[in-house]
UniProtKB/Swiss-Prot annotation:
<protein>
    <recommendedName>
        <fullName>Malate dehydrogenase, glyoxysomal</fullName>
        <ecNumber>1.1.1.37</ecNumber>
    </recommendedName>
</protein>
<keyword id="KW-0809">Transit peptide</keyword>
<keyword id="KW-0560">Oxidoreductase</keyword>
<feature type="binding site">
    <location>
        <position position="162"/>
    </location>
    <ligand>
        <name>substrate</name>
    </ligand>
</feature>
<feature type="binding site">
    <location>
        <begin position="160"/>
        <end position="162"/>
    </location>
    <ligand>
        <name>NAD(+)</name>
    </ligand>
</feature>
<dbReference type="Pfam" id="PF02866">
    <property type="entry name" value="Ldh_1_C"/>
</dbReference>
<dbReference type="GO" id="GO:0005737">
    <property type="term" value="C:cytoplasm"/>
</dbReference>
<dbReference type="GO" id="GO:0030060">
    <property type="term" value="F:L-malate dehydrogenase (NAD+) activity"/>
</dbReference>
<keyword id="KW-0816">Tricarboxylic acid cycle</keyword>
<dbReference type="InterPro" id="IPR036291">
    <property type="entry name" value="NAD(P)-bd_dom_sf"/>
</dbReference>
<dbReference type="InterPro" id="IPR015955">
    <property type="entry name" value="Lactate_DH/Glyco_Ohase_4_C"/>
</dbReference>
<feature type="binding site">
    <location>
        <position position="124"/>
    </location>
    <ligand>
        <name>substrate</name>
    </ligand>
</feature>
<dbReference type="GO" id="GO:0006097">
    <property type="term" value="P:glyoxylate cycle"/>
</dbReference>
<feature type="binding site">
    <location>
        <position position="137"/>
    </location>
    <ligand>
        <name>NAD(+)</name>
    </ligand>
</feature>
<feature type="binding site">
    <location>
        <position position="271"/>
    </location>
    <ligand>
        <name>NAD(+)</name>
    </ligand>
</feature>
<comment type="similarity">
    <text>Belongs to the LDH/MDH superfamily. MDH type 1 family.</text>
</comment>
<keyword id="KW-0330">Glyoxysome</keyword>
Length: 356
């Protein structure tokens, strides 16, 4: 039997989340890792979400808490993390959840992580392009990647923050300056383009979208998003009108959601789904599963550009192989040239941000 003092201490710990922290910049009882019984966690990987209180971060945290490959889930943001952490932590799944609030706790959030996912930043609003977000999100990604370089340099890093065509090069430059850059471990998340392509193609063909796979190459904004409709699985053919319609809709999928939400947000739910799907693929690769192939925006030599989105095979070290683009038809070759021109500018913009 435990004595009265021990029982009181235990009840104090259990009730600590009911009191808000005295300051957002001070560690609250909820945020202390010592209050989590880590030894009871399921076997698996340690994952951190940076920007966990945002529109993408919250549903992404929910989905990662449900992933059986996750043993420890760290949620970091500059606001509202205690509430999100308390909410998510009540789910009876295996992952132990810990919350971290504000810049002083970034290092604790990152230490020992196997996978770091970055959805942090401001969302798109009507009339905004992804590049309009650059000046704000570029600085956020730089700060977070400096923390990663210091605290978990061997982690796999999934970059969601837009514009991905620039933020991935920013992350690479930060890691280079820190001496920790490993191109195999830095991946820009373009999975939402693939998810949309699968959905829209399935609608046109009258198929189940779960049975459709459309490679999407290039980048993650506008004309840099190039679906390879000639390589759809299962094999099928499209009219020129269908090709034009599908390509345009896939490229403008993000804008479609922003306009439909009429100022109330961007594609947060579908992005969280896509991000969790890609993160799961990375974790299965880390586990050693064979045949894990996803599209991602990575350091690449498949074109003359230093970064490019294409199919990659994932494994224990992150990217194990970057697959060739395969045969492209005339429409796709023309689209590729248009995409490369815009991509080159976006990549250089990211590099210049760090080296200015």
């Amino acid at each position: 039997m435990e004595d009265a003092a021990a029982a009181a201490r235990r009840m104090e710990r259990l009730a600590s989340h009911l009191r808000p922290p005295a300051s957002q910049m001070e560690e609250s009882p909820l945020l202390r890792g010592s209050n989590c019984r880590a030894k009871g966690a399921a076997p698996g990987f340690k994952v951190a979400i940076l920007g966990a209180s945002g529109g993408i971060g919250q549903p992404l945290a929910l989905l990662m808490k449900m992933n059986p490959l996750v043993s420890v889930l760290h949620l970091y943001d500059v606001v509202n993390t205690p509430g999100v952490t308390a909410d998510i932590s009540h789910m009876n799944t295996g992952a132990v959840v810990r919350g971290f609030l504000g810049q002083p706790q970034l290092e604790n959030a990152l230490t020992g992580m196997d996978l770091v996912i970055i959805p942090a930043g401001v969302p798109r609003k009507p009339g905004m392009t992804r590049d309009d977000l650059f000046n704000i999100n570029a600085g956020i990604v730089r700060t977070l990647c400096e923390g990663i370089a210091k605290c978990c340099p061997n982690a796999i890093v999934n970059v969601i923050s837009n514009p991905v065509n620039s933020t991935v090069p920013i992350a690479a430059e930060v890691f280079k300056k820190a001496g920790t850059y490993d191109p195999k471990r830095l991946l820009g998340v373009t999975t939402l383009d693939v998810v949309r392509a699968n959905t829209f193609v399935a609608e046109v063909l009258g198929l189940d979208p779960r049975d459709v796979n459309v490679p999407v190459i290039g980048g993650h904004a506008g004309v840099t998003i190039l679906p390879l409709l000639s390589q759809v699985n299962p094999p099928c053919s499209f009219t020129s009108e269908e090709i034009s319609y599908l390509t345009t809709r896939i490229q403008n999928g993000g804008t479609e959601v922003v306009e439909a939400k009429a100022g109330a947000g961007s594609a947060t739910l579908s992005m969280a789904y896509a991000a969790s799907k890609f993160a799961d693929a990375c974790l299965r690769g880390l586990r050693g599963d064979a045949g894990i192939v996803e599209c991602s925006f990575v350091a690449s030599q498949v074109t003359e550009l230093p970064f490019f989105a294409s199919k990659v095979r994932l494994g224990r070290c992150g990217i194990e192989e970057i697959l060739s683009l395969g045969p492209l038809n005339e429409f796709e070759r023309a689209g590729l040239e248009k995409a490369k021109k815009e991509l080159a500018e976006s990549i250089q913009k990211g590099v210049a941000f760090i080296n200015k």
